[in-house]
Amino acid sequence: MSEIHLNKAAYIHNLTKICDKAGGKENVIVVLKDNAYGHGARLIASEAKKFGIKNCAVKSECEANEIADIFENILILSHVPTGDESAKFTYAINDIDALLKIKENTKINLAIDTGMHRNGLDISELDYAFEILARRNLELLGAYTHFRASDELNADYFVQRENFSAAKAKILALCDEFGIKKPIFHSHNSAALERASEIKDEMVRVGIAQYGYAQFNGSLNLKPVLSLWAKRVSRRVLKSGQSVGYGAKFIAKDDINVATYDLGYGDGLLRYNGLGELRLANGELILGKISMDSFSCKDSGEWVCVFEDANVWAEFFGTINYDILVKLSPNITRKFI
């Protein structure tokens, strides 16, 4: 069966670089949503915990429950309130309605909309928000924002940073007014951490950077953690003039030794239609279309590395490395090496 190999040395290297930039392990929230960006949530969570990371963020209660025995401090970013929230977790508040619907006495983080206009409270809503959280005895542990373009060299990042500074000042004033303990602030995602000369928040939230992908090449000297491996199912001699795969997109000009390997778009690979040159990590071309459960190439032995840098496939398909990674099926065996 196909496998995902996780390079432990690379992961530790990346965490070390991130923590150095953030000012310490205690200042880092690792983002483990969507199966740790396809890497395997429990494996990554365990290694991060061993390294000394104490805080993480996930998408949902389901994801939080998966690693609840590993991390004590788990922030759920995309929760829709049910009124039955767990005391084990901290929940992001993404609009005023969430404050009204979430279970009383629940631990929360306020998401602040500083310009992305996806989730979060507007600064003008903070007075009302504090009235609600005080009345409902909600435990305010943190407040944060998300930068919409920290990976682009334009003014958006600086505008949002100033907006968040204003929101922080307002929140601190309201905490004094309502007798509420000062929350932890966090705003810097991976790209923002890379470009920041100074971090004025207590914590940073890093997702893609811990897995080895920088938005600004060389800024943190990160190393990709994941490599994808396929196992040979069969092999044969493809005669000159014969084709392999659906649609006969590849026709051999000479006799060649070909093999079929056990990965396809059913396992989360983007579907290659046989046009253009899509290469494996060893430089060999994928021959013909990728099938649901397999692909073919020149026989490369019992195992072949499909990719060890998601950017290669992202560039070919005109997408981003996140897209390549998060689609990888949870059914693929994952292990640290």
Swiss-Prot record:
Active site residues per record: K33, Y246
Cellular component terms (Gene Ontology): cytosol
Necessary cofactors: pyridoxal 5'-phosphate
Name this polypeptide is given: Alanine racemase
Function per UniProt: Catalyzes the interconversion of L-alanine and D-alanine. May also act on other amino acids.
Enzyme superclass (EC): isomerase
Domain of life: Bacteria
Taxonomic source organism: Campylobacter concisus (strain 13826)
Family assignment from sequence similarity: Belongs to the alanine racemase family.
Modified sites of kind N6-(pyridoxal phosphate)lysine: K33
Chain positions recorded as substrate binding sites: R118, M292
